[in-house]
Curated annotation (Swiss-Prot):
Name under which the protein is recorded: Dehydrogenase/reductase SDR family member 4
InterPro entries for this protein: NAD(P)-bd_dom_sf (IPR036291), Sc_DH/Rdtase_CS (IPR020904), SDR_fam (IPR002347)
Residues at the catalytic site: 183
Originating organism: Mus musculus (Mouse)
Keyword Acetylation in record: yes
Site (described: Important for the maintenance of the quaternary structure, the catalytic activity and cold stability): 196
Site positions per UniProt: Responsible for the stereoselective reduction of 3-ketosteroids into 3alpha-hydroxysteroids and benzil into S-benzoin: 177, 180
Reaction(s) catalysed (UniProt annotation): a secondary alcohol + NADP(+) = a ketone + NADPH + H(+); 3alpha-hydroxy-5beta-pregnan-20-one + NADP(+) = 5beta-pregnan-3,20-dione + NADPH + H(+); 5beta-dihydrotestosterone + NADPH + H(+) = 5beta-androstane-3alpha,17beta-diol + NADP(+); all-trans-retinol + NADP(+) = all-trans-retinal + NADPH + H(+)
Motif (Peroxisomal targeting signal): 277-279
A single cellular component GO annotation: mitochondrion
Length: 279
């Protein structure tokens, strides 16, 4: 009888802990003292991810191509009491990638997390009208720069005993967005990049996963939803009848970077409101 009572008491205590955690009565910092680099992180999805990682205890280095955007993002997040610094970084330039890493090392003596979010989409139209210049730009920034950024941070993660990389892809890698051919192709390539890096880096205790957002309401995606009729049509085609918010992506990334996801590697998590997501 006493044994049953102790068992029941243990279950009750565990259940109360779950209840308190889910209701926000307790909050741990799953990324406490981790150092995170987030590219293209002064607006939209990248900014929401940077904020969430910092809220969960990480020291975050944000970046953007424009100094004014970096200054604004850093001021906002530091104003919220978060550990955030920033630097200008054009991910397509090797010298800028090096400066981003150097900044993190000087301030925090290491790197544990990379979120590769930078992407471009300079074309809207028929695939047959895409120039070689456009193809080169899209693949260079969206795919090659992502690979080079990962290559650059891996030695620093090894020094820390491991790390976590999250590549921000898109549901467009699975299901084409009309008139965005080169962008769609680049995001499909990131699915393969994730799988290959995940397999190669796992022995180094570095996990690589991918986030595939659906249609998230940001400035970057505005061409797809700025007309109300188009937005309404998109909503009708979705299982969850709304467009996503940047914050819908942020918690998933924080989870993937945490020890709670220590046995997750090479996976793509779709945050798309039920958008079809299979190749």
């Amino acid at each position: 009888m006493q044994k049953a009572g102790r068992l029941l008491g243990g279950w009750t205590q565990a259940w109360m802990s779950v209840r308190m955690a889910s209701s926000g009565l307790t909050r741990r910092n799953p990324l406490s003292n981790k150092v995170a680099l987030v590219t293209a992180s002064t607006d939209g999805i990248g900014f929401a991810i940077a904020r969430r990682l910092a809220e969960d205890g990480a020291h975050v280095v944000v970046s953007s191509r424009k100094q004014q955007n970096v200054d604004r993002a850093v001021a906002t997040l530091q104003g919220e009491g978060l550990s955030v610094t920033g630097i200008v970084c054009h991910v397509g330039k090797a010298e800028d990638r090096e400066k981003l890493i150097t900044t993190a090392l000087k301030r925090h003596q290491g790197i544990d997390i990379l979120v590769s979010n930078a992407a471009v989409n300079p074309f809207f139209g028929n695939l047959m009208d895409v120039t070689e210049e456009v193809w080169d730009k899209v693949l260079s920034i969206n795919v090659t720069a992502t690979a080079m950024m990962i290559k650059a941070v891996v030695p620093e993660m090894e020094k820390r005993g491991g790390g976590s990389v999250v590549i921000v892809g898109s549901v467009a890698g699975f299901t084409r967005f009309p008139s965005l051919g080169p962008y769609n192709v680049s995001k499909t390539a990131l699915l393969g990049l994730t799988k290959n890096f995940a397999a190669e880096l796992a022995p180094k205790n570095i996990r690589v996963n991918c986030l595939a957002p659906g249609l998230i309401k940001t400035r970057f995606s505005s061409v797809l939803w700025e007309e109300k009729a188009r937005e309404d049509f998109i909503k009708e085609a979705m299982q969850i009848r709304r467009l996503g918010k940047p914050e819908d992506c942020a918690g998933i990334v924080s989870f993937l970077c945490s020890e709670d996801a220590s046995y997750i590697n090479g996976e793509t998590v779709v945050v798309g409101g039920g958008t079809p997501s299979r190749l």
